[in-house]
């Protein structure tokens, strides 16, 4: 089989071009790597407009779509119902939103539901140590299956009287302007399991 010289040169040029194009396209693929999520990686720090780092993403346990938030910053202190004992105070109902996945009600499985417990803390300074006398009795444990629910806290009678006295004093003195100087402020500490 005799091949023309010009045809052989054209075949060699086409073969070298296809090899070059194939190598060029594969080189582009080699530069792409899988973006694996690592919670403590430095690339997950947020950078502000001045080039400073403002925070980091920290993950532990099961990653949920959103943490719980209070629907309102105000919690009404109701009068003690007659059917409660003298030792127990009136329950405080805290409406929460955005808990868990916020989807339809699903059976409690790991990764779907979330167990929440919390406590109300009195006194100024969110970073201060939680002394036993400054911590109200714990809120009920509940399993959250939906995106909207409530947390029920039951202060005892002594703590309820203390809250009522603080509310009365703050109302008379008009000290609602500065949250740090107002000892009547309650802070909610929510723990996720």
From Swiss-Prot:
Its main location: periplasm. The keyword ATP-binding does not apply. It is found in: Periplasm. InterPro entries: PapJ. Keywords: Chaperone, Periplasm, Signal. This protein maintains pilus integrity and thus is an important participant in pilus assembly. It may function as molecular chaperone directly or indirectly in the correct assembly of PapA subunits. This is Protein PapJ. It comes from Escherichia coli.
């Amino acid at each position: 089989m005799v091949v023309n010289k010009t045809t052989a040169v054209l075949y060699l040029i086409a073969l070298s071009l296809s090899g070059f194009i194939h190598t060029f396209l594969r080189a582009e693929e080699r530069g792409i790597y899988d973006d694996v999520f690592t919670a403590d990686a430095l690339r997950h720090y947020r950078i502000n407009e001045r080039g400073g780092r403002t925070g980091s993403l920290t993950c532990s346990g099961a990653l949920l779509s959103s943490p719980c938030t209070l629907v309102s910053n105000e919690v009404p202190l109701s009068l003690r119902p007659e059917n409660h004992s003298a030792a127990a105070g009136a329950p405080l109902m805290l409406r929460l939103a955005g808990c868990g996945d916020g989807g339809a009600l699903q059976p409690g499985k790991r990764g779907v539901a979330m167990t929440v417990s919390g406590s109300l803390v009195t006194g100024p300074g969110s970073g201060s140590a939680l002394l036993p006398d400054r911590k109200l009795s714990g809120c009920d444990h509940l399993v959250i299956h939906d995106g909207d629910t409530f947390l029920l806290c039951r202060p005892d009678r002594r703590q309820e009287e203390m809250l009522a006295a603080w509310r009365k004093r703050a109302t008379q003195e008009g000290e609602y302007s500065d949250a740090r100087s107002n000892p009547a402020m309650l802070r909610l500490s929510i723990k996720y399991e």
